[in-house]
Regions:
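Activation-segment/catalytic-loop signature of the eukaryotic protein kinase fold
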Residues: 88
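C-terminal lobe helix-coil module of Hanks-type protein kinase domains
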Residues: 186-285
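Conserved short submotifs of the Hanks-type protein kinase catalytic core
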Residues: 92-106, 110
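Protein kinase catalytic-loop region centered on the HRD/HxD motif
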Residues: 129-141
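Activation segment signature within eukaryotic-like protein kinase domains
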Residues: 125-126
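Protein kinase glycine-rich loop
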Residues: 24-31, 36
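AlphaC helix of the eukaryotic protein kinase fold
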Residues: 54-76
Length: 302
């Protein structure tokens, strides 16, 4: 029996009607900030994803206010590459979001299963993510926690970015949650590590780290501690993918460098600029390496 099915038998929310509308049917996943359930919207007769914040995040009225404010901001983003937010509320003192339920997986699961991607596939996901970020940034919404776990990959259609606003709701209260630096440290922009301040370029940095990982099969400095990794983000340039994979074209190295320049002033100015660079890199990829990918250990090879 899977862990989630076991939790279904003990979780008090399973079977409960939330807000006189959402019938919780099963637990989908548990993350650092919330537990995600599948629920049935009994009013509109459709399945939805119900994300319930962990209790320790709702210990102050200030957090609850920030949570609702950021949820409203996220709900304004209407784009095929952004997971839609339908509703919000409070259950047993814990804030919740009602979101679009995606039939598919996430980028982390795909990387775990396959190790690394070909250049065209990595650039396709990068394009999807940047197009979603462009829409959000134009609405004044910064994600702050771009990482593979927050990139959902449907069975059809573009990849979708999830959890807009949640990281900011937490970070305005504290840089730390349950002893860990907010935002997965492997993807954190230098300015967030230093000051917790972020803008659109901070999200682009995280996209650059994900692109590096999609190509090489690992994030930079993967074998070091969280504090050491944060220090590298602040003090060191992200290595070129070609340092690990000599066959990677220079245009890909240049793209990763443009996204991950430590000084935001010298980074890609916005998602539109980044998309132009991605298109150029895609057009310049030689056909004889288009199907190559890094040979790394992964679940499918075990």
């Amino acid at each position: 029996m899977s862990d989630e099915k076991t939790h279904d038998q003990t979780d008090p929310l399973i079977g409960r009607l939330i807000d006189q509308r959402y019938r919780v049917t099963r637990r989908l996943a548990r993350g650092g900030m919330a537990t995600v359930y599948v629920a049935q919207d009994e009013r509109l007769e459709r399945p939805v994803a119900l994300k319930v914040m962990h209790p320790h995040l709702a210990e102050s009225d200030a957090f609850v206010e920030r949570f609702h404010r950021e949820a409203r901001a996220a709900a304004r983003i209407v784009h095929p590459g952004v997971v839609s937010v339908f509703d919000q509320g409070v259950v047993s003192g814990q804030g919740f979001l009602v979101m679009e339920l995606i039939d598919g997986t996430n980028l982390r699961a795909l990387l775990n299963a396959q190790g690394a991607f070909t250049i065209p596939r990595a650039l396709r996901y990068t394009t999807d993510i940047l197009e979603a970020l462009r829409a959000a940034h134009r609405m004044g919404v910064i994600h702050r926690d771009i990482k593979p776990e927050n990139i959902l990959v449907p069975t059809d259609g573009p990849a979708k970015v999830a959890d807009f606003g949640l990281a900011r709701a937490v970070s305005e209260g504290s840089m730390f949650t349950t002893g860990n630096m907010l935002g997965t440290v492997a993807y954190i922009a230098p300015e967030i590590a230093l000051t917790t301040e972020a803008d659109a370029r901070s999200d682009l940095y995280s996209v650059g780290i994900m692109l590096y990982e999609m190509l090489t099969g690992a994030v930079p400095w993967a074998d070091e501690s969280a504090l050491q990794i944060a220090s590298h983000h602040v003090s060191d340039d992200v290595p070129s993918p070609s340092a690990t994979l000599p066959w990677i074209p220079r245009e890909i190295d240049d793209l990763v460098a443009a996204l991950t320049t430590r000084d935001p002033a010298n980074r890609c100015a916005d998602a539109s600029d980044a998309l132009d660079l991605v298109a150029r890199a895609a057009a310049s990829t030689p056909s004889d390496i288009a199907n190559r990918r890094a040979e790394v250990a992964h679940e499918d090879s075990r």
